[in-house]
Amino acid sequence: MSVKIDKKRDALLKDYAIGMLKDFYLNDYEDSPQEGFRRASIAWSGGDEELAQRLYDYVSKKWFMFASPVLSNAPNGHGKGKGMPISCFLTYVPDTLEGLIDHTSELRWLSVYGGGVGGHWSDVRTVSDVAPGPIPFLHTVDADMIAYRQGRTRKGSYAAYMDVSHPDIIEFLNMRIPTGDVQRKALNLHNAINITDEFMEAVFAGEEFDLRDPKDGEVKESISARKLWERIIEVRFRTGEPYLNFIDTANRHLPQPLKDLGLKINGSNLCNEIHLPTSADRTAVCCLSSLNLEYYDEWKDTSIVRDLVRMLDNVLQYFIDNAPDTVSRAKWSAERERSIGLGAMGFHSLLQKHGVAWESDKAREINGVVFRHINAEAVAETERLAVERGEYPDGIGSGRRNSHLLAIAPNASSGVILSTSPSIEPSKANAYTHRTRAGSFLVKNRYLEEVLEEKGENNESTWTSIITQKGSVQHLPFLNEGEKAVFKTAQELDQSWLVTHAADRQPFICQGQSVNLFFPAGAEKSYVNKVHLDAWRKGLKGLYYLRTEAKSRAENVSEKVERVALQDDTRSIVYSKKNCPWCAMAMEELKLRGILFDKVDLEEIGKTASEVTGRKVNTVPQIYIEGQYIGGYEDLMAHLTGATAQEGEECRACEG
């Protein structure tokens, strides 16, 4: 199959994005991202050469991005890919010894195949004289996540879900807090709580709430619903988790054909945007890729949405045809319901491109127009595919090829590759260090750059002040109030607006959204509480991380890293390696500040980072300024500006 590529389109990508693609997504023989884009476009075209060409043109123009495994595991020619093109899996954990052992085996295989896993533990009986409860088993899962992964590309990741009514909910809530019995902790896992309508109604009414053993329904304890809710919010504010999964809302929106089969949603996935049924014989799959809303005006009148629905149906079929017997439940689920999850990124970039403030009715209007259009196009294509290829087996008579079509994943890596705002969330800063699987990169808001250029203020002094203010522009006297509103950062926004936008688009999204919330460190408890309550009241299916403003690392770094002078050497040195985006950004920062330095390539001199620094380090860059040891890139940023690098662990599997 012939697909014409244009290597000049590499110029549309930042250098660090190209480095990231080469390090994690391209095959060894692929010299350009365009070659990787061609490989994936052909692989997922279903043999349609015209579709393959369109897919290549879309992705090379940054209109969408393949999910990480869809790109990295796309086969070349008629061979098989390095792994499965599935981002994540959702598994049900039965309340039997056989089921628990089987879950462990399946989990290990799923991690090796490269997918993050959401495990649903609500039916495992509580602690008793004859049963240890779910926590010790979760401790073993915690160890598995360290051991099992797909090569260097995808680390094993796991999110455990438990009903709020489970008698072990308090211990489950605290299992990621590193105090207490280490044998009952799971520090490498994520946790999520299935929040029911009954519980929320008890919270509002100030009533007691029953904790029931899932084995027989026996009430083990009655507690204050409000106190439990307050504890949940407190732990979220402290650790960023647990995710909240509004399980009854999700089940109400399950397609009727699946309800008629007695299926139900028992939890979500690693990133809380996938809402599919699981059972003892069904492991749901996440088949993802995402549109770039920043370029909505360019692609809205094309067939891109329809083409991507068709492409994802092809990806799903490849998984069904090639999945090994070790993941037979996932294959069965994919075959029966054929769910896909077309997502989006770049929403905040789209607003800023048009000079629209996040906290505005105009933003709500754009939000509705965009997602109404995506939904209509996706539904039209699945109906076309049903005629062409047949309806999904669990939905005969539905007129659809796929039981689910849309899901908004976090898109951390995809957003970095396309230099756009991640997912449907606001930008964290207008100049910041963004941490992803490939490292940390300095990112500047290009729409702000355009405004600064028009005002004659696009200079080192302005950007240094923005970085010093942790990415904020509210201090800049030459910006008017409207411009300051457009470029508010995530933590400067009223978080109620994030919930409002999510609620406005939810009717057009059959699955869910990875909705992060951002609060300053000293946020009022009543404000944080109200935003969370509104998320349930307004019909969201869940909430992902709660991000709080981190303290400046400047002092912490000085405590962690001994800053000693090199003996008889007061040079500034950057020890680096080729194709290292961290190194390139470090040197850019030093040049920006007029700091002269020597660049030393460790590969050329045949030394390791540990050897040249005399420290137990194995990463680059390693930086000295005037003989003083600084450390890596993030340490450099803290040393130069006191700016806070972006905290928190992004979803490592569902970066659609």
Indicate residue ranges for each PLM-predicted region.
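Non-catalytic, surface beta->alpha helical segment in thiol-disulfide oxidoreductase systems
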Residues: 625-647
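Thioredoxin-like thiol-disulfide oxidoreductase module
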Residues: 600-618
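Extended catalytic cores of very large enzyme megasubunits
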Residues: 1-563
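A short glycine-rich beta-strand->turn/loop micro-motif centered on a GG-aromatic cluster
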Residues: 545-547, 573, 597-605
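Short acidic, low-complexity intrinsically disordered linear motifs used
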Residues: 645-656
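Local sequence-structure signature of Cys/Sec-based thiol-disulfide redox active-site neighborhoods
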Residues: 240, 565-598
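Structural micro-motif
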Residues: 145, 541, 614-624, 633-634
